Swiss-Prot record:
Cellular component GO terms, alphabetical: mitochondrial inner membrane
Keywords: Membrane, Mitochondrion, Mitochondrion inner membrane, Repeat, Transmembrane, Transmembrane helix, Transport
One Pfam family of this chain: Mito_carr
Name of the featured protein: Probable mitochondrial adenine nucleotide transporter BTL1
Protein's membrane topology: Multi-pass membrane protein
Amino acid sequence: MAMVVPKEGLVVMDKESVSSASSDSHLRLQPHFPDFTIPVKDFFKSREAREFLSGALAGAMTKAVLAPLETIRTRMIVGVGSRSIPGSFLEVVQKQGWQGLWAGNEINMIRIIPTQAIELGTFEWVKRAMTSAQVKLKKIEDAKIEIGDFSFSPSISWISPVAVAGASAGIASTLVCHPLEVLKDRLTVSPEIYPSLSLAIPRIFRADGIRGFYAGLGPTLVGMLPYSTCYYFMYDKMKTSYCKSKNKKALSRPEMLVLGALAGLTASTISFPLEVARKRLMVGALKGECPPNMAAAIAEVVKKEGVMGLYRGWGASCLKVMPSSGITWVFYEAWKDILLAANTKPLI
């Protein structure tokens, strides 16, 4: 039984009461973890989540169809086997059978899902964010910031949201998915050393550690930046100009296919020498003939094969990039239309 004795505002309790109060206090001090289900559900209801998923689905469907062209393209770029598309095709079939055309496709499918999800999702998100920022800053364009005798207007209207979004998309997807690109190239170029994904991962790790999965990251970023920027910029500008000239609000599926293919062709042609140098750097380590940097790789190609050596495999690349770019946009827009139409329902 507790005895309460008032003394200068204090409450005195016996041992039993203290023990009981301590027990109650202990119960009340149990850790309470926040409920993350609501923000997770909100995310999967968001436009961004649906755009990321649309990109993943579009990439997977496109890659499954075009894997043989990717195999031939990679072999020609790195200088393996025949110098012609038909010759390279027959060489692969004779040595490895028809399944050789899908060499590395396992890793291709694993790679393309996060790559396209991150790339297309990032492009859409950054484009909207940049456009919104420009609209907000336009309202205060007349305002000037003065620092001593120097004054300037905080305007960013001269910056293209599409170009920034394209560059951001390429950088983000490359940083996250580069190890998968390394694995794909090893499986494609040296199937005798890396016959499967399960063997390639431990062999690369034993030889070079974690750094082995990021071999050639610098050159990859250098090559990806102009390609990604040009690709998204060209597609968006062609789409906008075409819709304006035809007084249309949106492209039809065949029009997406054509404009996507043209954007891929333009971007690939501009950035192809950097792609050749990047592939030589990445695969050169396997032969013990790795140039020290991208400039050295380009110089080596020009010295051995002439300037046209920088475009070796360009035809195969266009044969792969053009349909890939066009089909990807068709699938992406189709999935986006489907998923955004049910915007009130969570994806999971």
